[in-house]
Amino acid sequence: MITERQSNILNLIVDLFTQTHEPVGSKALQSVIASSSATIRNDMAKLEKLGLLEKAHTSSGRMPSAAGFKYFVEHSLNLGSIDEQDFYQLVKAFDFEAFKLEDVLLRASQMLSDMTGYTAAILDVEPARQRLTGFDIVQLSSHDALAVLTLDESKPLTVQFAIPKNFMNRDLLVLKGIVADRLLGKDVMTVHYKLRTEIPQIVQKYFTVTDNVLDLFDYIFVGLFRETIFVSGKVAALDYAGLVTYQFLDEEQRLALSIRQSLSEEEMATVQVADSSEPALANVTLLTYKFLIPYRGFGLLSLIGPVDMDYRRSVSLINVIGQLLAVKLRDYYRYLNSNHYEVH
């Protein structure tokens, strides 16, 4: 455990270093810390011995270690802080008309990435927490059709497919009836379970050849079990992390899993400093913020960047964007659920 003065010294060094990326000497701290230069140097030496500070090769100053950043985050960082300038700037950026949920999510990830210079990712409600509330098949021609799946009465998913060659005219209606009878209204995990257990038995009752029918079921429904995730600023990873992290960001389902694992069920926000179990994220910082998606659940907004990022600034930005997201989505879903008639 460190003393209050040592904690103040560490906090100040973190703040100065994240703004200048230059090692900090004892003289730079004297105007804020009411102690002699010798006392400050002794405290800096103790912090170095504890592994919270480290020497710079080209300077007599000190800079925070990964452990020092982690200590700062755990003991001094206010995860609820907001900068008013960020708020007013981002309010203007959120003043746009959204035609679908994805427009709002993508805009949020782009803004967070643009304003930090790092990588931002945003996730929709976890698939397991969604329900299949609508299903239809629209035949486009004699050879292809479009399946329209609706989640939580508001999120559409469309899948275009070639009609199997052995299908008769009635078979698409039969398939639609099976879905309506057995899968509609069920949560996604139940849908997944029934596709593996109950549906194969039912298909045998209605179809002579079942293999391609079951393949079609899998093809239509596989999208239900994938995370909806938008990632912005991937190229920035080459600057703050390297090729391994950059390549990992293209594996969006693995990235989504790592983000979900960084936050417990009870937490609304968290910061992982070089602490991810995923090797590609083991040497970076992962900030994650949970935001409300009305009527449906929670989404996650994450910022991925270097260990020596400006934490106060990053936390402010992710908080502001998260709060504006909730407001924007509330208005969006309120509009979807309203009776909107325009009289001329």
Curated annotation (Swiss-Prot):
Recorded superkingdom: Bacteria
Keyword check for Plastid: no
Gene3D superfamilies: 3.30.450.40, Heat-inducible transcription repressor hrca homolog, domain 3, Winged helix-like DNA-binding domain superfamily/Winged helix DNA-binding domain
A Pfam family of this chain: HrcA_DNA-bdg
GO terms of biological process kind: negative regulation of DNA-templated transcription
SUPFAM superfamilies: GAF domain-like, Winged helix' DNA-binding domain
InterPro entries tied to this protein: GAF-like_dom_sf, HrcA, HrcA_C, WH-like_DNA-bd_sf, WH_DNA-bd_sf, WHTH_HrcA_DNA-bd, WHTH_transcript_rep_HrcA_IDD
A GO MF term: DNA binding
Record keywords, A-Z: Repressor, Stress response, Transcription, Transcription regulation
HAMAP family in UniProt: HrcA (MF_00081)
Family: Belongs to the HrcA family.
Protein name: Heat-inducible transcription repressor HrcA
The species this protein was found in: Streptococcus equi subsp. zooepidemicus (strain MGCS10565)
Gene giving rise to this polypeptide: hrcA
